[in-house]
Amino acid sequence: MSAQISKLATVSDGAILGEGVAVWDFSKIRENSIIGDHTLIGDYVYIDINVSIGKNCKIQNSALLFDPCVLHDGVFIGPGVILTNDHNPRAISNTGAKKASTDWDKVGVEVFTGASIGAGTVCIAPVKIGNWAMIGAGSVVTKDVPNFALVLGNPARQVGWVGKKGLKLIPLDDSNFLCPVTNEKYSLSNGILSEMANK
């Protein structure tokens, strides 16, 4: 099954789209970007040059993903999310001259497997969003987010942990947590939450 591309979308000849990719109306995918198998791109999405997106991702309407961001497999990007690439943005240099593309160092956002970024969130590069982390809608992320962390607000702060199902985990004690639906257990050690061997 080849990619399904809306006639109203713009996809550069230099972009690589995997099997089963869907690109909806008025989205733009730039050259040298890579979109993994079965990823869905909503309406009015902008994917910059050199962006890498894994398999089975969902990029919702009006999201803006700037070079050099990387999304691993199974990432959810909500409507209106912005992944930035310039920590010190300026239109002109200190001399007043117009800045060229070589006048600044691009920095990126990296989103790891299974993570979700809620609608209207802005991630200020450089940041890394850990595996299965969840960012609440409307957040402004200014620092790295640990695996399974639940963060929200401006600036985004951690308010708990979530499991792979995306639900807030119930603390059993200071270092053990439980998913209220799947009964999967997680263990916290040195600030790192890990999934336990669930049987």
Where are these regions (language model features)?
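Flexible, glycine/small-residue-enriched loop-and-beta-strand segment within the central core
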Residues: 4, 13-15, 22-128
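Cys/His-enriched microdomains
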Residues: 158-161, 177
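Short metal-binding segments enriched for Cys and/or His
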Residues: 185-199
